Amino acid sequence: MKFFLEREFRQHGPDGCALLIDVHGYYASIRHEITNQRFERKLPPSHYKRVRDVLDHQYSGETGYNPGSQMVQLAGISVPDPIDHYIKERLRADKYLRFMDDGIIVHHSKEQLEEWCEAIRQQYAAIGLELHPRKTRIVRLQDGFRYMGFIYRLTPQGKVIMTVDPKNVKSERKRLFRLAQLVKAGKKPKSALYEQYRSWKAHAAKGNSDKLLGRMDEYIKTLLEGIP
């Protein structure tokens, strides 16, 4: 994402926009028929049959999955795959990213993004999915936007400010607190707490997060007080 914003500034300056794409009720709305088509196209016949048998056994009806299993996560990645190709190859949007049901396109023209948004809306509708009316929107790069746990903002001078979303920090603090309670109760090893924090810290360190990480280091010390 940071690379796209820097490239947008080099090509067109700081006044560009981003189209944020979010699918409403994504996993609950995925059609089983579409999932089967995607897996059948990508997998050998014997593998496809096993995958379909598992999904058919676990999920009755024609739509909807629980996103907990790895197989369903793969379905979540694969279902919009033709739309990815449509956006990159037909619309020629060269600054496009998607993870599961969250996508983003960076472009210098708001009007172009408005046209693309309607075209993308129709593509999702064709496979039974609806774009979220509130979360799918166009924002100015200088105003900032949330994507994948970070808040991004492009300054007039072309610097990309990338900070951890406060919602992400709050969620992680709660997760660490619960883990610390389990460690104190002897139900989890101390290493589980360290590993969780190391993983999150590596992610947060990708942004402008020095002060935040300093505060989180102190928070970890507080959680570990009294733990041998």
Mark where each language-model region is.
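Conserved polymerase palm-domain catalytic core
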Residues: 3-100, 105-119, 123, 129, ...
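Right-hand nucleic-acid polymerase module
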Residues: 21, 57-61, 66, 85, ...
